[in-house]
Regions:
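Repeated loop/turn-to-beta-strand initiation elements of outer-membrane beta-barrel proteins
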Residues: 59-65, 95-100, 132-136, 174-180, ...
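Membrane-embedded beta-strands of outer-membrane beta-barrel proteins
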Residues: 50-52, 85-89, 122, 166-168, ...
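Outer-membrane pore/translocation modules
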Residues: 67, 75-163
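Residues that define the transmembrane beta-barrel architecture of outer-membrane proteins
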Residues: 25-27, 44-48, 79-83, 116-120, ...
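Transmembrane beta-barrel strands of outer-membrane/channel proteins
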Residues: 31-37, 65-71, 102-106, 122, ...
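Residue-level signature of outer-membrane beta-barrel architecture
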Residues: 54-58, 91-93, 126-128, 170-172, ...
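Short glycine/proline- and aromatic-enriched beta-strand/turn motifs that initiate or cap beta-hairpins
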Residues: 20-64
Length: 243
């Protein structure tokens, strides 16, 4: 966690300092709070999913930072207590369809039995579609992972590995009102064929104002090493602002 925070601070300082002497800088902030509640005579359950994102963009570089927290209970038992922080940057050279990226993230997850996990690495990406109302992007790269997991609920598992990280990102805006957006990952260990991670984040938003939307979101995570997965489907509000 300390490594991610330190990397955030260094890159943010470098990015904002260079902005004083180069092209204009644009900022974007987004916050989404979604959840679900179920109450019956036989039991109660609730889930709250909070996501915060911040983006700084220039002509030849973008910096993204984000954090999420998911908490859920069923009756008196905790089902989710999951947090994640991430930072990535993109560097564009010449043809903007192709760019290079770097990533660092840290997460903990009660539902996936992750005590601590750090990932860091980089790669390349290509924009197959890049328009004001539609984006389709595929990226691939290598990540180093250091993890502290819990196998079968009782067995500690501290290890590290290198992963190939493949991501497909899309965004489709219909009539400036409806927004379909998603990031979907497959991360396979290079040395262990049965060690893989699947992460899917997809949402449908309907704009009420330029800055406010109603959002339905679907999140799926699978960690094959711990044999755990979760599926979250919830709804709520998204607030966003460009400046």
């Amino acid at each position: 966690m300390k490594r991610v925070v330190l990397l955030w601070m260094v890159l943010l300082y470098a990015f904002t300092s260079s902005a004083q002497f180069s092209d204009s800088v644009h900022y974007y902030v987004k916050y989404a709070s979604t959840g679900s509640v179920n109450r019956t005579n036989d039991g109660n359950s609730f889930l709250l999913n909070n996501n915060l994102g911040f983006k700084i963009s220039k002509k030849k570089m973008t910096l993204n930072m984000g954090a999420s927290y998911v908490y859920g209970k069923q009756d008196h038992s905790i089902t989710n207590n999951d947090m994640s922080t991430a930072m990535d940057f993109n560097i564009y050279r010449g043809e903007k369809k192709v760019y290079f990226w770097g990533l660092a993230n840290y997460d903990k997850s009660y539902s996936l039995k992750i005590n601590n996990r750090f990932q860091g690495g980089g790669g390349a990406a290509y924009d197959f579609i890049k328009r004001s109302n539609a984006t389709l992007n595929v990226s691939d790269g290598i990540l180093f992972e250091n993890s502290d997991l819990m196998l079968h609920d009782t067995i500690p598992d501290v290890y590290h590995t290198f992963r190939n990280s493949l991501r497909v990102y899309y965004k489709w805006v219909i009539k400036d009102i409806i927004v379909l957006e998603g990031s979907n990952y497959v991360q396979n260990s290079i040395t262990h064929g049965n060690d893989y991670i699947i992460k899917c984040n997809n949402s449908l938003s309907v704009k009420l104002r330029s800055w406010l939307s109603i959002t339905a979101a679907m999140t799926y995570n699978k960690l094959n090493r711990t044999d755990r997965e979760n599926l979250l489907m919830n709804y709520g509000l998204t607030v966003e602002k460009f400046f």
